[in-house]
Design a protein with these regions (language model features):
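Structural motif
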Residues: 43-49, 91-98, 135-140, 177-186, ...
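Loop/turn-rich, solvent-exposed surfaces of beta-rich toroidal or solenoidal domains
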Residues: 153-189
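Short loop/turn segments that connect beta-strands within beta-propeller blades
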Residues: 52-56, 100-105, 141-145, 188-192, ...
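Beta-strand-rich domains and repeat architectures in extracellular enzymes and scaffolds
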Residues: 15-46, 71-74
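A short beta-strand motif characteristic of beta-propeller blades
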Residues: 11-18, 57-65, 106-111, 145-151, ...
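Repeated scaffold domains used in trafficking and secretory/extracellular systems
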Residues: 21-28, 67-76, 113-124, 154-164, ...
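Short loop/turn segments immediately following the C-termini of beta-strands
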Residues: 39-41, 87-89, 132-134, 173-176, ...
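Blade-loop segments of beta-propeller domains
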Residues: 56-86
Length: 239
């Protein structure tokens, strides 16, 4: 659906998430469940958490780090799998892209990528990754072949992105520090040119709403901007 224009967001509620979430990264929402990736920088561990969406109750947790690759990022899912990038904690570092079962969180398969993949979206034809600060896009086949790489024409630093409504929906920041603006961008999936942009504010803790995880499902925008105690913000989207 090229040319989609987002014209209104209404905050419906926020859901406190149970337990220590460390430094949150990406989210995925489906079937009454919420999945969250997170990194414990002190212990050098990566985490995948599963929650009951309605209540924020934690259901399961799995460690995802592999060697020096401890930093999971923004991620996505298909019908039965979660596709999660877990990278070395530095620009240009290697990444292992893991395919994990939504039913059990167990690792099903994986492949390595020669760059730090900080966000990953599942497309019908493969996997779209964005590197550190989203300066480049990389496209992989589902069996791990790097098919192409190209520069991101947008200045935003995307943390999480999904293929929704025929576009790439990417959430992140424009600018840095106190001047950073929270944005959700709709990108053309072939050219990555901007179709639409919605600018959001900050939480009552002063954190930009798109600081970390994002998903868009059934007319609802889900944002997880804050580390522990983490809150999932739910917005109604009106087109």
């Amino acid at each position: 659906m090229h040319g989609l224009v987002l014209f209104a967001l209404t905050l419906l509620r926020f859901i406190p998430l149970e337990g220590e979430t460390c430094h949150v990264q990406g989210i995925a929402v489906d079937g009454g469940r919420l999945w969250v990736t997170s990194v414990d920088r002190t212990a050098r561990k990566g985490w995948l958490f599963e929650y009951e969406l309605e209540t924020g109750r934690r259901l399961r947790a799995a460690e995802v780090q592999q060697g020096e690759m401890v930093h999971p990022g923004g991620f996505d899912h298909d019908g039965e799998s979660l596709w999660i990038p877990v990278a070395e904690y530095r620009p240009g570092g290697k990444t292992v892209i893991q395919r994990r079962s939504k039913a059990t969180l167990e690792l099903m398969s994986s492949f390595e990528a020669p760059d730090h993949i900080g966000a990953l979206a599942v497309l019908p034809e493969g996997l779209l990754g964005a590197n550190w600060d989203a300066r480049q896009f990389h496209f992989f086949s589902l069996d791990g072949k790097l098919l192409w790489s190209r520069a991101n024409p947008q200045p935003a630093r995307y943390q999480d992105m999904k293929r929704r409504y025929g576009a790439i929906v990417a959430a992140g920041l424009l600018g840095r520090g106190a001047d950073a603006r929270a944005v959700v961008d709709w990108l053309d999936p072939e050219t990555f040119m901007l179709l639409s942009r919605e600018t959001l504010g900050r939480t009552d803790r002063g954190v930009p709403f798109t600081n970390e995880g994002m998903d868009l499902r059934d007319g609802l925008l889900y944002l997880l901007p804050e580390d522990a105690p983490s809150r999932l913000f739910v917005f109604r989207v009106e087109y």
